[in-house]
Design a protein with these regions (language model features):
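N-terminal nucleophile
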Residues: 1-279
């Protein structure tokens, strides 16, 4: 399963949308090197998932390919706010081709997956996050927007969205509130990297078997570009850099900087390593 968090970070007067997740797939075994965030082929948005991989991965690939098949979606003439409707239609359309159901079953099983579409809208000049989920009452996918926190001071701006198993999500929410209260930011200010710290600690503590592996992280900027950021995992001392959930091999590198999970204030160039001859 998953614990995924999307939030608007405000630092130095600049806003960026951060999407982060654990990297574990489970089901009789733990596989801790899997992408749960997919950069869509239009630079300003990503889609992430929580739930059953057999439902999620095909639909995320359908979303990716559908953008390639429709030029306005790829060149961003279709704004992010309309892209979510396109993806809803793609998901529903794809499920029409499920057949050979068990004897006596009339409709396919409900998909056990939830998605988060996160990105920057050139129309509204804002970051947005929507959860896409299957609504059994209408028999199709629908979406719900993430909203800003209420009861905040005038200078505060907190937009955050969680996807994942109920227990880890509830734990993450409680920890974030406690952390913000301890730092005097519960009603004032904006989110920085506090959600990252919460995700980091939950993974490290190993309290939830469905949540584990390296943190994967993507940043989306107001210039409408999304980039995957590396994370030293389990810590900087290990020297191991993970990108989109997978630890890099010796001869691989990343162009977009690396975060120290214990000092996540900024992404820095990776520590120098000796080049490795590749076959």
């Amino acid at each position: 399963m998953t614990l995924g968090i999307s939030w608007v970070r405000v630092a130095g007067g600049v806003r960026e949308l951060i999407v982060a997740s654990d990297s574990r797939l489970s089901g009789g075994q733990f596989w801790d090197a899997n992408p749960k965030i997919v950069l869509l082929p239009r630079s300003d948005a990503v889609i992430s998932f929580a739930g059953h991989t057999g439902d999620a991965y095909p639909l995320m690939l359908q979303a990716y390919n559908s953008i390639l098949m429709y030029p306005p979606a790829q060149n961003r003439a279709m704004d992010l706010e309309h892209l979510k409707g396109h993806l809803n239609r793609v998901f529903d359309h794809s499920r029409k081709f499920i057949s050979n159901l068990p004897r006596g079953q009339v409709v396919p099983d409900e998909p056990e997956a939830k998605f988060a579409l996160s990105g920057y809208s050139w129309k509204s000049k804002k970051f947005h996050v929507w959860t896409l989920h299957f609504d059994r009452s209408i028999g199709r996918f629908t979406f719900k927007p993430a909203s800003t926190w209420a009861a905040q001071d005038e200078d505060a701006y907190k937009l955050i969205c969680y996807i994942g198993d109920a227990d880890p999500v509830a734990e993450a929410k409680e920890r974030l509130v406690s952390l913000l209260r301890a730092r005097g930011k519960l009603r004032s200010g904006s989110l920085d990297m506090e959600p990252f710290e919460v995700l980091r600690d939950i993974i490290r503590e190993g309290k939830f078997g469905s949540v584990g592996g390296p943190i994967q992280l993507v940043k989306i900027y107001e210039h409408a570009n999304a980039v995957p950021v590396g994370v030293y995992w389990p810590d900087r001392a290990s020297g191991s850099i993970s990108v989109l959930g997978r630890p890099l091999m010796e001869y691989e590198t990343t162009r977009w900087g690396v975060i120290d999970p214990d000092q996540p204030d900024r992404a820095r160039p990776p520590d120098a390593v000796d080049p490795v001859d590749t076959p």
